[in-house]
Regions:
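Intrinsically disordered, low-complexity segments enriched in serine/threonine/proline/glycine
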Residues: 18-19
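Short, positively charged low-complexity motifs
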Residues: 1, 9-14
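Hydrophobic alpha-helical elements and their junctions with loops/disorder across both membrane
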Residues: 10, 27, 150-152
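Short, positively charged and aromatic/hydrophobic N-terminal segments
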Residues: 15, 24-27
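Conserved catalytic or regulatory cores that recognize and/or transform ribose-phosphate-containing ligands
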Residues: 31-195
Length: 195
């Protein structure tokens, strides 16, 4: 309607009633106010992205750095990436075990509390399968995310395509680099399309 009034003024040289001008200005102000409210809500309610998987490289930091350049409001979470802390937390907090099974069992139990909560709160779950190790925990967390109907983005090299075909099929995107993951997240959250 605003465009129609402006079209009449400029094309036909017609006059416009002062109430129509007031109406146009009020609509513009309302549209701007709605946009400001949406932007403020977007900034106050960042998306939660859980970064799961391989802990032997800086892929998490690479994703965070790229997304920082996009200025995308995101709150990141991740499992405990300190390998020894993750392995030994149960024995440190609940008492040591002589049997390695029970040592691992205690640690896994404590880690599951953190994992479950963070995945439940996530809007997007990114799972990285690295080159060197068989990441059973990463596959497990991908399964949890899928069961909870979370948006799942996988990050792995082509050499794992066949082994991960079932997990790939259940994901929303399969990426080959941290930069690709960041670009996908930026597009999904803000509609930013950069190559």
């Amino acid at each position: 309607q605003i465009a129609r009034y402006l079209f009449q003024i400029f094309v036909f040289g017609g006059s416009i009633h002062p109430l129509a001008i007031f109406s146009i200005l009020l609509k513009i102000q309302t549209m701007n106010a709605k946009k400001d409210i949406q932007q403020q809500a977007f900034q106050e309610n960042p998306w939660n992205v859980y970064l799961s998987g391989e802990i032997h490289s800086d892929w998490r930091e690479q994703i965070k750095e790229v997304l920082n350049t996009y200025q995308v409001p995101i709150q990141f979470s991740e499992p405990n990436t300190g390998h020894s802390d993750s392995d030994d937390c149960g024995s440190i907090l609940l008492g040591s075990e002589s049997d390695s099974f029970w040592h691992d069992h205690k640690g896994a139990g404590l880690n599951s509390i953190r994992r479950r909560k963070l995945i439940q709160e996530a809007d997007i779950v990114v799972v990285r399968f690295g080159k060197k190790y068989k990441q059973w925990n990463a596959a497990f967390e991908a399964g949890i995310a899928h069961a909870l109907n979370k948006s799942l983005i996988l990050l792995h090299d082509e050499e794992h395509d066949h082994a991960l075909k079932e997990i790939d099929q259940s994901s929303a995107a399969v990426c080959r680099s941290p930069e690709q993951v960041a670009a996908v997240i930026a597009y999904c959250i803000k509609g930013i399309l950069k190559n």
